[in-house]
């Protein structure tokens, strides 16, 4: 990969998953004994990305402790959103202030990222650079998603 930096959005309250998220941040919810955050980091690691920034707000100490206990290959920096939640755009802007990179991958750990998504991300990166795009968004057809039977604003 040409892109060496990834941002992971982990600051939200996880209200849609209450009561599960009353005591644990949504990125640390586990499926098959692996948190969705770890699944996301494993995908990023498989892409050979060198540095990851994770923004935090709600139950941020749990995310920091989780990262500190693991031995992930990429350098991981935790960015605190401060006294007020910055929402998606503000969180991204805040994290971008911590890197000199112009090209970054942005991940939402709400999505269950499997390693087999790396093919799509690599193809997306090729298109991004070949067409000299300013940004590009990866979407998955809802019929192919894991949550196609769930209702909600997500």
Question: What kind of region is each of these model predictions?
Answer:
Residues 1-8, 30, 34-108, 112, ...:
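Conserved N-terminal catalytic core of the sugar/cofactor nucleotidyltransferase
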Residues 4, 27, 103, 134-136, ...:
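A generic secondary-structure signal marking the coil-to-beta-strand transition
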Residues 4-20:
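A phosphate-binding catalytic loop at a beta-strand-loop-alpha-helix junction
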Residues 19, 84, 144-145:
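Short Gly/Pro-enriched turn/cap motifs at secondary-structure boundaries
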Residues 22-26:
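Short alpha-helical oligomerization interface
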């Amino acid at each position: 990969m040409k892109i060496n930096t990834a941002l992971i959005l982990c600051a939200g309250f996880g209200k849609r998953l209450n009561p599960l998220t009353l005591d644990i941040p949504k990125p640390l919810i586990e499926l098959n004994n692996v948190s969705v955050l770890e699944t996301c980091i494993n995908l990023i690691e498989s892409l050979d990305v060198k540095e990851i920034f994770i923004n935090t707000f709600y139950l941020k100490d749990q995310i920091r402790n989780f990262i500190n206990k693991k031995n992930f290959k990429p350098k991981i920096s935790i960015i605190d959103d401060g006294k007020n939640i910055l929402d998606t755009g503000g969180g991204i802007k805040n994290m971008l202030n911590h890197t000199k990179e112009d090209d970054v991958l942005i991940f939402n750990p709400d999505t269950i990222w499997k390693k087999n998504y790396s093919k799509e991300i690599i193809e997306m990166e090729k298109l991004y650079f070949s067409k000299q795009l300013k940004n590009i968004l990866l979407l998955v057809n809802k019929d192919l998603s894991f949550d196609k039977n769930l209702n909600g604003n997500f």
